[in-house]
Amino acid sequence: MSPIDITAIQSHVAQHRDDIITFLREICAIPSMDSQIGPVGERVQAEMTKMGFDEVWFDSMGNTVGRIGNGPRVLVYDSHIDTVGIGDPDEWRWDPFQGKIEDGVFYARGACDEKGSTPGMVYGLAIARRLGLLDGWAAYYFGNMEEWCDGIAPHAFVEHEGIRPDFVVIGEPTKMLVYRGHKGRVEMKVVAKGKSAHAASNHLGDNAIYKVLPVIEGVSRLEPELGDHSFLGHGKITVTDMAVETPSLNAVPNGCTVYIDRRVTFGESVEGVIEQVRQLIPAANRERGDVTVEMLFYDEPSYTGFVFPVDKYFPAWALEESHPLVQAGQAARALTGLPDAAPGKWNFSTNGIYWAGKAGIPSIGFGPG
């Protein structure tokens, strides 16, 4: 591999500056909500082809993949290109897909989370190859779906495409710092079963909503008891949704499901966090079995019809600050002239829960926003 010449890199970037900006605006203009990433994936593939990638394709799940080189060492640049929805369009002050530039900042749906990292990855890899920086490497751009189930895309990529990287760079926003980990997550549900009756004769029913109230109250008070870690921080727990089964608005509900998001730090096991919630269920309900808790399971088909079933457990992970990949990220960042800063962490979840948390592949984050 050639020595890094930051001046040469900057010269190439300057030559492509307008194309990079246009590319970003165009991929943000293509809606990719609800994991529908086919059209934006095609646009990304067109740019990779233009920039001389050796191979571009859609994997079985429908994620976009581009490869440069075929060396023995494997590097993956990970950027999810799906987004959440836009909510009520009337509440936007500008078209979220057209976007706007204000004070040198580009605003659009997905500009930060996380389409903003894709142009830098695509052009960065192409420029690195031109400068001889990827000799001995197979380098991949991986534009994937992540919003609805973190880590499922890379998990399927490794198992079904047979590509297991040696190192991963995740493009989630890091404020242009190097990030080296984050808390994990467990999604669970508490299900209560009751008996319906007409509200005028509610004494004949068994209200399922009332059965989950002790759990909701308990969750609201549980956080001080959760685990803590000097780098990753304190565990978190939140009731995020509730679904009620009832014949009508004038009937006693016969079913109620409460959904819980539990952020886990090091030292907290999936079995332990589920048991914490189970202990919030009144003993009488636990004994009768009419209120239960279980981890969620994801088996929704992707837009291609591909199904990859996984439990919704996402482990915490962190690389040591002294790890060679973290140090390489810090060194690369220093070459750009950015102010010195210690490596940080995300306060949300990323595909790192699979790359590093489940597969044990050294991973770092670096991205705009």
Stretch-by-stretch model annotation:
Residues 116-221, 230:
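Fold-level recognition of mixed alpha/beta catalytic cores in primary-metabolism enzymes, strongest
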Residues 68-70, 79, 183, 194, ...:
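A generic beta-sheet turn/junction motif
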Residues 2-107, 130-135:
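Acidic/His- and Gly-rich active-site-bordering loop/insert found
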Residues 102-113, 338-344:
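Short pre-catalytic strand/loop immediately N-terminal to key active-site residues, enriched for Gly-Thr
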